[in-house]
Amino acid sequence: MFDFRPFYQQIATSTLSAWLETLPLQLKQWEKQTHGDYIKWSKIIDFLPHLTADHIDLKSAVKAETKTPLSSGERQRIIHHLKQLMPWRKGPYHLYGIHIDCEWRSDFKWERVLPHLAPLQNRLVLDVGCGSGYHMWRMVGEGAKMVVGIDPTELFLCQFEAVRKLLNNDRRANLIPLGIEEMQPLAAFDTVFSMGVLYHRKSPLDHLTQLKNQLVKDGELVLETLVVEGDINTTLVPTDRYAKMKNVYFIPSVLALINWLEKCGFHNIRCVDVETTGLEEQRKTDWLENESLIDFLNPQDHSKTIEGYPAPKRAVILANK
C-alpha cells in the first residue's frame, strides 16, 4: 500500500488545498476496493533497491544513471522485479542501464505535442488518464512546478511508484488513482492534458466539461484523441469493437471535435497535429506479452482496422478555458 500523506502535505498550502475536503476519504475507499494483485504489485516496489542517481534526465528522456554502473547481477534483479509489473504500455524508460522498452514509444507523441504547448515552466499540471506516468516525468523535465496524474488502474500506480523510486523518489510528480469524474471541480490547474481518453468516454462532452472544470481561467487544454476524416457532422460510432477495443464510443472528425469544444465553452481552439499511428510507435516488445497494433489492423490493408474501420489516426487539439 502507498502512503498518500506526503501528497496531502504538498497540496495543503497550494491552490489544490480544497481537494483535501474529498480526496483522503476517496482514496481510503479506493484502497478497500483494490484486488489481490495490487497487494502483490505494491510489494514489488519494496524489493527494488534504494539507488541514488548521479544524473537524471527528464528533458530529453526519462533516464537515471550512476557514476558507477550496476553489476550485471544487480541489473538482472531489478529487471526481474520490473517484469513482474508487465505489461508496460507507455515509455520508454532508461534506468541504470536497463531499457524498459514499452509497447508505445510515448516519446514520439511528446515530440509532436511539446512544440505547440504554452511553456510548462512553474505550471501546475493535470494529466488525465496518465497511465504509468511517462508523460508526467517529461512535463517535470519541462519545468512544471507540480504534475498530478490521475488514473484508476492499480497496475499503473505501481509502475509509476517503481519508476519514482528509481528517480530518487522525486515528489514533483504524483499519481492519484481516481478517474476525472471523481474529482471535485478545482479550477486550479494551468495546463490539463487528456491524451488517449476521450474515445473511451460514453459522454465525450461531459468529459470535456470535466476537463474545463479543472482549469484556471485561460488555462490550456491539451487534447489528444482518435479522429476520422470528415466534416463537422462526421463522427464514427463503432458498432462493436474498434481495433479490438470494446470500449471505444465516439471518434469525431477534427471539425466535429472543434465544434464539441466550442459547445463546451472553450476558445482559441486549434488543431496542431494529425498523425496516423505507425507500427514503429506501437508494437510488441519483451515488456509486453499482449497483442499490439499489428494485430489490430487488417493484415491485407493496414489503412483499415481488423473490423474494417479507418486505421487509428490521432489529432492534437489545444484550447483555452
UniProtKB/Swiss-Prot annotation:
Enzyme class, UniProt record, top EC level: transferase
Taxonomy, superkingdom: Bacteria
Record-given protein name: tRNA U34 carboxymethyltransferase
Matches recorded under InterPro entries: CmoB, Mo5U34_MeTrfas-like, SAM-dependent_MTases_sf
Subunit structure and binding partners: Homotetramer.
Keyword hit for Transmembrane: no
Function: Catalyzes carboxymethyl transfer from carboxy-S-adenosyl-L-methionine (Cx-SAM) to 5-hydroxyuridine (ho5U) to form 5-carboxymethoxyuridine (cmo5U) at position 34 in tRNAs.
Catalytic reactions on record: carboxy-S-adenosyl-L-methionine + 5-hydroxyuridine(34) in tRNA = 5-carboxymethoxyuridine(34) in tRNA + S-adenosyl-L-homocysteine + H(+)
Organism encoding this protein: Histophilus somni (strain 129Pt)
Homology family: Belongs to the class I-like SAM-binding methyltransferase superfamily. CmoB family.
Binding-site positions, carboxy-S-adenosyl-L-methionine: 90, 104, 109, 129, 151-153, 180-181, 195, 199, 314
NCBIfam families, per the entry: PRK15068.1 (NF011650), tRNA 5-methoxyuridine(34)/uridine 5-oxyacetic acid(34) synthase CmoB (TIGR00452)
Keywords, ordered alphabetically: Transferase, tRNA processing
Gene Ontology biological process terms in this record: tRNA wobble uridine modification
EC number(s) given by UniProt: 2.5.1.-
PANTHER family: METHYLTRANSFERASE, TRNA U34 CARBOXYMETHYLTRANSFERASE
One example GO MF annotation: transferase activity, transferring alkyl or aryl (other than methyl) groups
Pfam families recorded: Methyltransf_9
